[in-house]
Amino acid sequence: MQYKKSDFYYDLPEELIAQTPAEPRDCSRLLIYNRATGEVKHEIFRNIIDSLNAGDVLVVNDTKVLPARLYAHTQNGGTVEVLLLKRLNKDEWEVLVKPGKKCTVGKKLVISEELSLTVKDITPSGERIVKFEYDGVFEEIIDKIGSMPLPPYIKTKLQDKNRYQTVYAKHDGSAAAPTAGLHFTPELLRKIKDKGVIVTEVLLHVG
C-alpha cells in the first residue's frame, strides 16, 4: 500500500493542546490499542501498569535535555536564535540558527558577557558548525542563560525546567525531551519493577 503525506493530516484544535504539564505527571491521558483485537481504550497514564506483565521489558531513554536555546547578538545589534544540536568536541557544536542569513562563515555572535561563538562552517542541510569561546565552565553557563527548547505549539513559559525532564534523566545532550517518558513518576516505576517488569535504560539524544 502506498501512502501520501496528506493521509496523515488531521485537525488538532489549539484549545486541545495542553500548555502546562499534568500534575502529578502520571495523571495524564493514555490511549491503549490492542493489536490483536483492535480494541481502543482511554486510560489514565498510571494505569499503564495494568498492561504490563512480569517478564516484560520496558525500555526508557535516560537522555537529559539541555537548556539548549540561546539568544545571540550580531555586531549590528540583530538577534539570532541558536539551538544546540550536537557537541562535536570540547568547544565546537552543530547548531540551528534563525535567521540563517545573519550567520555566515566567520561571523561572530555574542550571547552574554561570558559566552560568544564564531561560525566555522555550514553543513549541506543548513546547520552551522560553531566554536564557542567562554569564561568559566560551559555547562554551568548554558544552564544559567539557556532556555528549554519547548515545541513551537507550547506558548506558555516553562516555570520549572525539571518538568521538561524525565525523572530518570542522567546524560546531558538532548535538544528535546523524549516526551513519552515525561509521564512516569518514581512511584509508578517502583510499582512496575515490583510487578516483575524489567526496566532497562538506553541513551539516545533527541534533536
Labelled PLM ranges:
Residues 1-207:
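A cross-family signal for N-terminal binding/gating loops and helix N-caps
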